From Swiss-Prot:
Core component of nucleosome. Nucleosomes wrap and compact DNA into chromatin, limiting DNA accessibility to the cellular machineries which require DNA as a template. Histones thereby play a central role in transcription regulation, DNA repair, DNA replication and chromosomal stability. DNA accessibility is regulated via a complex set of post-translational modifications of histones, also called histone code, and nucleosome remodeling. PANTHER family: HISTONE H2A. This is Probable histone H2A.2. It is found in: Nucleus; Chromosome. Expressed mainly in non-dividing tissues of the plant. Also found in meristems and dividing cells. GO terms for molecular function: DNA binding; protein heterodimerization activity; structural constituent of chromatin. It comes from Arabidopsis thaliana (Mouse-ear cress).
Length: 132
């Protein structure tokens, strides 16, 4: 009865591959799928939804980490701290809009001095000699 699709003597089990590796992602697709199911966001969750969400989250994390790494390098540091993440997010227009209401702990504030508080230029505010 070997002709009915059954293989004889082949007891080698196929190694399972994760959905993250199938999609080429680092973020856990299975865990995100579990969160979507247990979170009661919908009664049913499609097979592609957790893969897509994992890809979006991975992209956002990579984008923030790249910009924060650049901010750390600009400050001559080798370790990314929350201040670097704050500078990276607030200097990027799209990320700042996305995370506008988010407070980053130990992030500090953006350096900003109002133009009225800056000292006057010496050459620009000189009175002219013609006025007597």
């Amino acid at each position: 009865m070997a002709g009915r699709g059954k293989t004889l003597g082949s007891g080698v089990a196929k190694k399972s591959t994760s959905r993250s590796s199938k999609a080429g992602l680092q973020f856990p697709v299975g865990r995100i799928a579990r969160f979507l199911k247990n979170g009661k966001y919908a009664t049913r969750v499609g097979a592609g939804a957790p893969v897509y969400l994992a890809a979006v989250l991975e992209y956002l994390a990579a984008e923030v980490l790249e910009l924060a790494g650049n901010a750390a390098r600009d400050n001559k540091k080798t370790r990314i701290v929350p201040r670097h993440i704050q500078l990276a997010v607030r200097n990027d227009e799209e990320l700042s809009k996305l995370l506008g209401d988010v407070t980053i702990a130990n992030g500090g504030v953006m350096p900003n001095i109002h133009s009225l508080l800056l000292p006057k230029k010496a050459g620009a505010s000189k009175p002219s000699a013609d006025e007597d």
